Amino acid sequence: MNIPQLDSTYIANTYARFPVTIARGKGSLVWDADDKVYIDMATGIAVNSFGIADPAWIRAVTEQLCTVQHASNLYYTAPDAQLAQLLCEKTGMKKVFFSNSGAEANECAIKAARKYAADHKGPEYHTIITLKNSFHGRTITTLAATGQDVFHHDFLPLTEGFAYAEANNLDDLKAQVAAHKCAAIMMEVVQGEGGVIPLTQEFVKGAAQLAAEQDLLLICDEVQIGNGRSGKLYGYMHYGITPDIVSTAKGLGGGLPLGATLLGEKVQDVLTPGSHGSTFGGNPVCCAGALSILHRLDGPLLQSVREKSDFIVKALTGAKGVRSVTGLGLMLGVETERPVKDVISECMARGVLVISAKNKVRLLPALNIPMAQLEQAVSVLKDVCAGE
């Protein structure tokens, strides 16, 4: 059997895969099993921050792999302590809990928020307000946090204690807070799976003010938009707010599984021994790779992300067959007149890999994609959208 046949025979049917078997890659180029080359504008869904087989990242993880690959959290290791220090220094947060994915990072954020509320106001203050059209993960609790019924219907009953407000509707958010005994407000500043839709400045700042007034924790889910993808280190930094908790993953590990929950001053000591844990969380190899990523997310790199974003937006806005371009930094959604599936398929045939988010083409290129490759990929997408 070939690889697709092996996959369909032995792997659970949870993914609708594209008809491409990725064999190898280098930077923003990937080759399939037939040696056809593609420009990668998806990066494993915003994971490969510096593309495939990035030399500095490979050196970091290989050196650590040949030293200690795993020790458990019963002992100290250097990479996780150093990574936590760097994350706190770059964000102003105080403590970090490491896990293996965005869903796990969000689980930790939810647990920390509920424990803080129980400790300070009582266990009945457990409701977390999230936004409609949000996506926070696929565990039974992060599904409950996700404000999209399409993900809920097969898995009832979900974890209780979540309510949903309309995104960018501050009055509705206030109404939901008033109607429940709340622990926190949780949001993605750019709703990724919901269609790459940024929240407005007015709404985010209003939500932060509301949280402060009501003694609620503010949780920012930075799983997809975080780690430089927005053009700042984290997306919330575009809004001039300071969350109490930040969850992130994807691009932080650069290709290895790593989640992080950053805890601000108010909640830095809320998690105590035995209250949470993860066997693999803070794995030294994953953290070594993340250190390589995070050290390079500096001013010049972030400026280049913003410049590349401006290029894409300018090139596609108003182009034939393009209805709108939304998003932030190098996390963009392109609403097309043609069906999204057709656009993705035709781009693939022409050697460009893009993915979808609801009714949009989603663009998630490597942060360091060369301009020549970016220009070529955008040119292909423009032609496909125009039906040329």
Regions from the language model: what does each represent?
Residues 1-388:
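Conserved N-terminal phosphate-binding loop of PLP-dependent enzymes in the Aspartate aminotransferase
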